[in-house]
Amino acid sequence: MTMDALSRLVEALRCLPGVGPKSAQRMVFHLLQHQRQRGLHLASCLEQAMKHISHCQQCNNYTEQTLCALCQNPNRDSTLLCVVESPADVSAIEQSNSFQGKYFVLMGKISPLDGLGPDDIGLPKLKELITREKIQEVILALSPSVESQTTIHFIHQLLKDETVNISQLAHGIPSGGELEFLDGNTISSALKNRAVINV
């Protein structure tokens, strides 16, 4: 059975997190009934983003250039590196206005059940960056979970021969909580009260 344009759009919107069939249908009907021009603008912006946004060659954050704006910024503290799971976490920390160093985005956590090992999340690239840029402190800003603890352990082992301090965010971030959904004050407090890791 072939789908018509309306059904295809409803089905396409369901790929977004938290959007079920009813929500997707409401969005489509709203755009068709009240916001056709904005719907066309949305489609155009989405197409441009999908075509032109890729990953920064140094930190893996999203960018339209070879290096993202944060990596290019000479005013950032290049001796301080914050390691996060996703570009959404970079955005959350930046909104807290509590960190002036550089970032490295892992694009996930080590998870054998999902087939993700150290190489899949870019740990060799992380080590290379730390050595090349002479990083003095690595802050592990990972959401609390079993996979995060596994990832932290692997990073610590990877860097054991490097002359670099390794710390992680202080408690206050709820277990199982996602960094991108926390308010700026919580993130700021966790960064300021980060703890040195002893594995």
Swiss-Prot record:
May play a role in DNA repair. It seems to be involved in an RecBC-independent recombinational process of DNA repair. It may act with RecF and RecO. It comes from the Bacteria. Belongs to the RecR family. One of its GO terms (molecular function) is DNA binding. Pfam families: RecR_C, RecR_HhH, RecR_ZnF, Toprim_4. This is Recombination protein RecR. The lineage of its organism: Bacteria, Pseudomonadati, Pseudomonadota, Gammaproteobacteria, Legionellales. A zinc finger (C4-type) spans 56-71.
